[in-house]
Amino acid sequence: TLNFPADCMVGLLGPDGVGKSSLMSIISGVRKIQAGKVDVLGGDIGLESHRTAACPRIAYMPQGLGKNLYMTLSVYENLDFFGRLFGQDKTERDRRIDELLASTGMSPFKQRPAGKLSGGMKQKLGLCCSLIHDPDLLILDEPTTGVDPLSRRQFWDLIKRIRVQRPQMSVLVSTAYMDEADGFDWLIAMDDGKVLAEGTPAELKSRVGVDNLDAAFIRLLPEAKRQGHKALVVPPRNVAMEGTPAIQAEGLTRRFGDFTAVDHVSFKIPKGEIFGFLGSNGCGKTTTMKMLTGLLPSTEGTAMMFGEKVTGKDLATRKRIGFMSQAFSLYAELTVRQNLVLHARVFDLPKDQIGPRINELIKQFGLENYIEDLAESLPLGTRQRLSLAVAMIHKPELLILDEPTSGVDPVARESFWELLIHLSRNDKVTIFVSTHFMNEAGWCDRISLMHSGKVLASDPPAKLVANCGAKTLEEAFISYLEKAAAANAATDTPVAESKSPPQTVPETPHALNTGFRWRRLFGYAYREALELKRDTIRLTFALGGSILMMLVLGFGINLDVEDIAVSMFDNDNSPASLRYADNIAGSSYFVQKPPVTDPDALERRLRKGDLDVVVEIPPNFGKDVARGANTEIAAWVNGSMPSRAQSVAGYVQGLHSDFVARTVPPSVAAPKVGIQPLLEMRYRYNQDFKSIYAMVPPTIPIILVLIPAMLMALGVVREKELGSIYNFYSTPVTRLEFIFGKQLPYAAVAMINLVVLSVMAVTVFQVPLKGSVLALLLGGFLYVICTTSLGFVMSAFTSTQIAAIFGTAIATILPATQFSGLTQPVSALEGTGAIIGKVYPTAHFITISQGVFNKALGFKDLIDPFLALAVSIPILTAISWMLLKKQES
């Protein structure tokens, strides 16, 4: 139970996993409340009515660098989109955007894509997007995690200036950085989902009798968690053990296309040293580590490990290295012991050494109580120690640790560093560790300050501080960053900002942002269209994929039975048998092959596949025909393809009947019983039985159900994966606005596909379009609305893009090909298949497509499938609306 003071900056303090983000998402209305009640801005946020009314007054910036941004959109386009979501017209949007960019010093980067901004700039842009509608409550979830110290300081200076202008705005912030929490008005310390204490920073420190928040937080932890904790002491390193450097890099460079991730980095790390790599997210730390271990080749420069050049194939050198990634490199479904055994076998430890080594590590790293626990069930600090034990299983001489303490509490962090110091000083293990925590950097023997792929300085922490005349390591880092920014005018981190906050006066009352608004709908549609236009892979798949499928299916699905290889096995050689052979050879469906001379040849050639059918004429065939006696002819058909064999048998039977009718006298062929009616079959459509006329028109609906549905599902699931779905959760956008806004661009692309595929049908496949073009276009429009709605429905059941691709493909292609009249009429289906065929949209558009192309039909003739598609749209939209949640569960 908590009461948050208004009109001030409140900080939630604690490591990852203690419940800060969950609490903030509940307060913002993004996440559902399972139990209890939360009053926000004068009402229960759990009630949809109050949540709808309060949403325009709240701004929520989720955790993660630029998580609420769209990386292919420019700075201006991101802000413009958020302005549309809050109902602002263009004049008001442009004014607010100009003021916000001027205040944050981002005006020079107005047209730069968000994906090309530095971490600090992304956070500033995210803040601008949150402030564009003048919120009364600003919620920031770890806004500066992974950001360099200079950008972090600029970010908080900006917040202070904005609060001076709008003192009535309450700010709720979560952070894991104790130094920045010291500047908040009110703090709430949390652990394991519970509140440890609350008060001003000064009150929390005085309550436990310490002078810094790091120590205060440790004192506030439960006794069980801080039992045995003592201040960390780093003994001096014995330089006498130095020899050949453990790591040596000269001019190490890595480029990805035009982007330089690591730019001519050089350093030397002696054996047994703890070397720290300090820098913000995206500065090149992880890329450098991967090059040093041979996991990633360098573009330029060399990396040496224990005097040997690092290559991806040098397994002997790799066995001297232990690597611990940010994700801990553990198998979640295995127990602690199983993880250790698996990695021991990976490194080829002798069987008799595996058991003792595992027992040694379990004792050394304090894992005795977790031996049979699954890795995924371990507390974060324990999982961290297990990951280090896994990295040490083969007794490496070098440990490379990539941000190993990110997100853990101060006690666990210091305990972890005690292990590292023991390994360095007692076991002579060289440790190369990356971090963005300043206090950790102070525990290293030497550190390199890295920014934008370059090493700014490399020295012991105390020397770096002294060289800059700074008081702390953070101030020293900021000094180096400012010098680098001054030397490079094109840097992403401008040193000059407007000192005045944005002078925005709300012109659109918050109350007007509720209800259905076309501006928000078209805002989503415009943003989706921009992203689709700039995503060459999706756009190529949408347009090029349709053309490719049309060519493959149009030419590949051919049910015509032609060029039938036939051979005669004539045992009579009479004029009658020759006439019979000529009757078959004269058919355009058959290709005459050399005759068969004996039964062995007949069987051999059929088995080899040279022949489709052999017609065997018996001896005395001519004589029997002449005197009207019964005689038989054998037709040996290759049955390896049953459907083709069935058609071949039918052709032979037809030619045989024709020969009998023309050769055998009617009195012999059939007894005359009264007057026989004369029936002649005439086919109204496709008189030549060409399968291309039957298959190409239905192929268009098949393509238009697969690709638009898949694109739609990917468009929604992609937002879930990237985190931009929070913009839907935390803004006044209604579910219908979101559905139709996402749907319109993909429906437009599908209509372009319909036109292209129809033109291909007429020009490439020579299938004439005999009916109403307008009827085809109207039916196509109704159909693509249905198919994109199907994709939206599928997105509700998937959370990854891979699952969306496969799930949507299965859910659309199977009903479309099996129950929609592609291979057999819907009227011929029975049971469940008949029900699916009658309700599935593809069946109705196949009727429209075939009717327009082959039967010259128009609106009046196709009224039933038009009505069926029109009725399907609100049904599918209603299903999408019900499945789409406005809050996280």
Give the location of each predicted region.
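Catalytic Walker B motif of ABC-type/P-loop ATPase nucleotide-binding domains
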Residues: 138-141, 399-402
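Membrane-spanning alpha-helical segments of multipass transporters and channels
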Residues: 222, 241, 548-554, 573, ...
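Conserved ABC ATPase "signature" region
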Residues: 80, 84, 91-109, 341, ...
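ABC ATPase "signature
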Residues: 198-199, 458-459
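Conserved ABC transporter NBD signature motif
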Residues: 36-47, 53-56, 301-312, 316-317
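Extracytoplasmic/periplasmic domains immediately adjacent to an N-terminal transmembrane anchor
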Residues: 511-693
